[in-house]
Design a protein with these regions (language model features):
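Structured alpha-helical segments in the cores of large, soluble enzyme domains
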Residues: 141-147, 171, 175-179, 225-232
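Active-site microenvironments that recognize anionic phosphate/pyrophosphate groups
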Residues: 1-164, 238-240, 255-258, 264-297
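Conserved His + Asp/Glu catalytic blocks
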Residues: 166, 184-187, 193-199, 210-297
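Short glycine/proline-enriched turns and hinge-like loops at secondary-structure junctions
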Residues: 155, 199-202
Length: 297
């Protein structure tokens, strides 16, 4: 009835504006989260996830369109997902965006400034978006959920500063800082190399959630012992790709060994196996670290 243009982009801008009027202010959401956290971390995330769906920040009606199933394989029961929930790009909105004055605010869709942002045709509205402040690695980080989650309670943890992705020892420590706060969640990082793709490399962030994937349940195929790290259980996981699992009681010790492995792998070249550490100055070797707490380890 003429309140907005009849396209997905403009309807999303409009309904998010309406929901923003009903969404509690950030301070109230943060206070409720930490009050519940005092009872248990799971109580806090359960409530925050339900809240994010109630405000329509997580568009559950669209997520229901995704095709998901589990199929048995020699490596365990694999989760297969076909993402059908993200709306198609609207040609009219694309044309309108080309005519708009370019904006560098927010710097990206992960920046904390997205909370409460009105949006535009080429940047989603976030008036119904609320984020939870955390401390990780001695600095300010924030927790939110993915509006288009691929699994249960698919969360995003992002740096309070707009700083690039980087896999190093400090990244490992931040992952452990998170699972110590939320032991029922796993958390991991995408690779930090442009050639891999699939991530926003300009803003440091991790992804996690409340789900158990097949790789988590996969057994150790070949056990290894690292000199000087007898307290760390290590081994190659039975998986179609190269996966090294490290397990121990002390996060700092695991971080030390993981960093040692990372540094060795970054410079590793084996032409016979078609593995090159770099070509024309472009690095090729990195890892995708994932942290979780299982049975106290």
């Amino acid at each position: 009835n003429g309140l907005c243009q009849d396209s997905v982009v403009y309807r999303d801008l409009f309904d998010t504006k309406l929901m923003g009027l009903l969404t509690p202010r950030p301070s109230a959401v943060i206070r409720r989260f930490w009050d519940l956290y005092a009872e248990s971390p799971k109580a806090a995330t359960d409530d925050y996830y339900a809240f994010s769906k109630t405000t329509n920040y997580i568009r559950a009606d669209r997520l229901a369109k995704d095709a998901k199933w589990i199929t048995p394989t020699p490596y365990g029961d694999m989760d297969i997902t076909i993402n059908l929930s993200k709306p198609e790009k609207d040609p009219k909105a694309i044309a309108a965006a080309l005519q708009m004055k370019q904006s560098a605010y927010p710097k990206c869709q992960l920046c904390k400034e997205n909370e409460g942002y009105a949006g535009r045709v080429n940047h989603p509205a976030r008036q119904n978006h609320r984020i939870i402040p955390l401390e990780m690695g001695g600095g300010p980080w924030f927790l939110q959920y993915s509006p288009y989650g691929y699994y249960n309670e698919h969360c995003i943890v992002f740096n309070g500063r707009h700083t690039p992705m980087k896999i190093d020892r400090s990244a490992f420590q931040k992952l452990f800082d998170f699972v110590e706060k939320f032991p029922h969640y796993f958390v991991g990082s995408n690779a930090d190399l442009p050639i891999v793709g699939g991530s926003i490399l300009t803003h440091e962030h991790f992804q996690g959630g409340h789900y158990t994937f097949a790789m988590t349940k996969a057994p150790i195929e070949t056990a290894y012992a690292f000199a000087g790290y007898k307290d760390i259980e290590a081994g190659i996981v039975k998986w179609p790709m190269s996966v090294l699992r490290l397990r121990g009681d002390e996060p700092a010790r695991i971080c030390d060994l993981a960093d040692k492995v990372l540094q060795a792998w970054r410079g590793y070249t084996d032409p016979d196996a078609f593995i090159y550490a770099e070509t024309d100055g472009t690095p090729h070797n990195t890892i995708t670290p994932i942290a979780r707490c299982r049975n106290g380890k």
